[in-house]
Amino acid sequence: ADGEYYETMNSVVGKLMEPGSTFKTASIMVAMEDGHINKNTRVDTGDGKWPMYGRIMKDHNWNKGGYGMLNVTRVLMKSSNIGVSRLIDGAYHDCPDKFVRGLNNLGVGLPMDLDIPGSGRPRVYMPKKAKNGHWILPITRNGVPMELGKPDLAWMSIGYALQLPPIYTLAFYNGIANNGRM
């Protein structure tokens, strides 16, 4: 009203967002580091729609017939949701904690030491196995620990079901450009 602009939040460091497709590279790197896949590993992406535990995962070209068989290199080139999620779910479905640990090893899920007011902390939760054998997260809803649902790992692998401030994505890709130094 007074013609002045006031920045109330530094969105780059403070706003939590689902990184979406920009996260696929991190997921693939974790699986490669753990020896589950290599650049020539092939995965069937079908006709662009794939059932994942009661939900349908789609690639952006699902209405044009999808991509069919792709190797890991092409999965990243095409930004295939199905390819990444099937590779990660296949490797880590029974051990999602190893996937999150791999993300942490890349520096993606760990808090950065930013001396900037309002800096956000990533929400990449480490699952642990409960006594009933289900995977639970270290967060609660109405006092009850939340379970890691069967489709959650697949969606996490393509940048959903987790949140990062945008600076984390920037730092990750800068690390790649700088030979691993973030």
Give residue spans per PLM region:
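Beta-lactam-recognizing serine transpeptidase/beta-lactamase-like catalytic domain environment
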Residues: A1-S21, A26-M182
